[in-house]
């Protein structure tokens, strides 16, 4: 069933707020774990995946840009660029996977590839910003973390889908 414009706008706004709250909560909890620099769970991206699967690319794009802008406002230029680049790479691969694989794609596949491409987008952003390819040396660490964290966020999405569908 299609949503009217007002309901879709308010749903996207609530999902953006939820993504910000999840990201903030994650930033409070994750420092308790001894993880390599730059490795995060990405709970806010669970919301973006939900948008992609249930509301479409446009809504996922809107939430991604809003998250990037919020990062820019609260953490500065570099964080805003990295959030936006990672998010755009991530939703692009998810869109491609959904279009190519249709019903064969699952939350775990979307999440792992989304995490991998999020990391690639951030590495591309930092390499462009500093005109240096040295950050690419961190790719093996980020690849392993993307697979692990992607599986966790995929499982998280699967668990929270019933609650999110009620929005």
Please annotate each region the language model reported:
Residues 2-50:
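Hydrophobic transmembrane alpha-helices
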Residues 4-15, 41, 45, 60, ...:
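Residue-level signature of transmembrane alpha-helical entry/exit and packing/kink sites
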Residues 14-16, 21, 63, 84-117:
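Short helix-perturbing small/polar motifs within transmembrane alpha-helices
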Residues 19-23, 71, 90, 94, ...:
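Alpha-helical transmembrane segments of multipass membrane proteins
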Residues 23-42, 66-94, 107, 129, ...:
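Interfacial aromatic-anchored transmembrane helix boundaries in multi-pass membrane proteins
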Residues 37, 77-84, 100-167:
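Membrane-embedded alpha-helical hairpins and interfacial helices in multi-pass inner-membrane proteins
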Residues 43-57, 93-98:
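Generic transmembrane alpha-helix motif of multi-pass integral membrane proteins
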Residues 51, 74, 125:
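Active-site-flanking alpha-helical
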